[in-house]
Every structure is written in structure tokens, then in C-alpha cells.
């Protein structure tokens, strides 16, 4: 009976070593995973200067900052990832980002009075769709983290190299989607800015079209009065004409000043949004790089479990294994 138990233990050890040995080529398989990452880094490199400006951009930056904070965990990373705290915090930050985006969009809509109602409705619909896509991508990030938490719990004590490679690939795809939708949202906001500028220019043009005929009529009447009236009357008409011209010039100057101010504000908003897009790409790149450090404690724990298993088998059989186990990294 003892001989049968010994044979069974030896067979079990042989099967474990057979399962562990194929893990070494997995490290070579991970090398192709680095190529998409390098390509993605080249894609986002030109926009690495994103700076938060608007409230919704600051809220989105806080969403990525929290993910970066989670990545910096070392000894307690397993406990933090396996808890619900990360998912709850990401949900709160995501809702805050969506709230700020709605508030910023409402603020822009107040400035779209001169824009045609049909154009305004179309642009608002497109912006709402872009906002929904960004929200969906952020929810995918949260869902993927929850799914990964469950997979890690199910694979404790087993090799997680394949899980790490698959999770890294998913996060790269999610990052590309979030950055792409952020760009799309910027484009929609740019259309809003163009609408504000167009409305301001149309208002100035309307003022000119309405006042110019009045000015021409005043000049015509002034010429008739000069021909028929006496000198004092001509002086009074001249004074009135000069006063009218002064007022018209003042109105035109104010309109031009307002148009210049609106253009400056729109350029400032565009610059801030471009800076925010660059910052999101830089933060996403850092998040991808730091995710790889999450699995080191799991690998060390599996190595310790393997050593304990070998010691138990050696104690049961009374002999040491002829071939040492292959460590996974």
C-alpha cells in the first residue's frame, strides 16, 4: 500500500513539473506584447503635454490620478485590488467627471443664442453621444478591474502570466478608446466654440446692415437741409450728424471689441482642451507601465507555496526530487 502511495506522489510531482516547464516559453511570448505598447507610445507621444483647465478636465484627471495611486501600492497591492474600495472610488470619480462635463456643456449652450436652432440641436446631440461614449469607456475600465479581481481570486496559487498578458492587452485597448473619445469630445466642443464665434460675427454684421442705411439717410437729409436752410440750421444739422456718426462709430467699436474678446476666449478654451488631452495620454501611458508591477507579489507567493509543497512531498516520500522545479517570473 505504501508503495502505491509513493508511486502516486511521484506521478503527481511529474505532472506538476510538466505543467510548470512550459511556463518558460511564456516569457518569450510576452515579448510580442511589448511591440503594440511601443507603437501605442509612439502614437500618444506627440500629445504628451495635456494640462487640465476646465472643471470637467480636472475631474477626468483625478480619475486617472486615482488609478496611478493604486498602481503605486507594493506590499498591500493584492489586498487593495481584491477589495471593493477601488471600484467604489472609480465609480465616484467617474460620476464626478460626468457631472462636470454636463455643467460645462450647459455653460456653452448659454452662449449659443445667435446659432440657428437646428444647428444647435444637431451639435448638442453629437456632443451628448461623445459624452456617452466617454462614460462607457470609463465604465469598461471599472468593469475590467472588477473582472480581474475575480480572476485573481480564482487563480490564487496558480500561474498568472497568461492573465497578466491578457489584462495588459485589455487595458491598452481601453486606454486607446478613452483617449480617442476624449479627442472626439474636444472636437464637439470646438464646434460649439465655432458656433459662438459665428453668432457673434453674425450679430456684428446685422448691426452694420441695419445702421448703414440709417447713416446714408442721415447724410441725404443733411445735404438737403444744407441746400434749403440757413447757416444756423446747417450748423445744427452738422452737429447732429457728427453726434450720430460718433455714436455709430462707438457701437461699431464695441462690437469689434466684443468679437475680439470672444475669439480670445475660444482660443484659450481650445488650448486648455489640447493640453488636457496630452495629459490624459501621458497618464494613461504611465498607468500601463505600472500595471506590470502588480503581479510580482503574486509570483513570489506562488514560489513560496511551491517550496512548501516540495517540502511536504519530500517529507512524505522520504527522498528529495531529482529535478528542481522551474521558477516562474
From Swiss-Prot:
Chain residue ranges for the region called 8 X 22 AA approximate tandem repeats: 92-267
Region named LDL and other lipoprotein receptors binding: 170-180
Positions of the UniProt region annotated as Lipid-binding and lipoprotein association: 222-302
Residues spanning the signal sequence: 1-18
UniProt-annotated binding residues for heparin: 174-177, 241-248
Location relative to the cell: Secreted; Secreted, Extracellular space; Secreted, Extracellular space, Extracellular matrix; Extracellular vesicle
InterPro entries: ApoA_E, Apolipoprotein_A1/A4/E
GO biological process: acylglycerol homeostasis; cholesterol efflux; cholesterol metabolic process; chylomicron remnant clearance; high-density lipoprotein particle assembly; intermediate-density lipoprotein particle clearance; lipoprotein biosynthetic process; melanosome organization
GO molecular function annotation: cholesterol transfer activity; heparan sulfate proteoglycan binding; heparin binding; identical protein binding; low-density lipoprotein particle receptor binding; phosphatidylcholine-sterol O-acyltransferase activator activity; phospholipid binding
Main location: secreted
Pfam families: Apolipoprotein
Chain positions of Sequence repeats: 92-113, 114-135, 136-157, 158-179, 180-201, 202-223, 224-245, 246-267
Region (Homooligomerization): 278-329
Sorted UniProt keywords: Chylomicron, Endosome, Extracellular matrix, Glycoprotein, HDL, Heparin-binding, Lipid transport, Lipid-binding, Oxidation, Phosphoprotein, Repeat, Secreted, Signal, Transport, VLDL
Post-translational modification: APOE exists as multiple glycosylated and sialylated glycoforms within cells and in plasma. The extent of glycosylation and sialylation are tissue and context specific.
Keyword check for Phosphoprotein: yes
Entry-annotated residues carrying Methionine sulfoxide: 155
UniProt protein name: Apolipoprotein E
Species whose genome carries this gene: Zalophus californianus
Source taxonomy: Eukaryota, Metazoa, Chordata, Craniata, Vertebrata
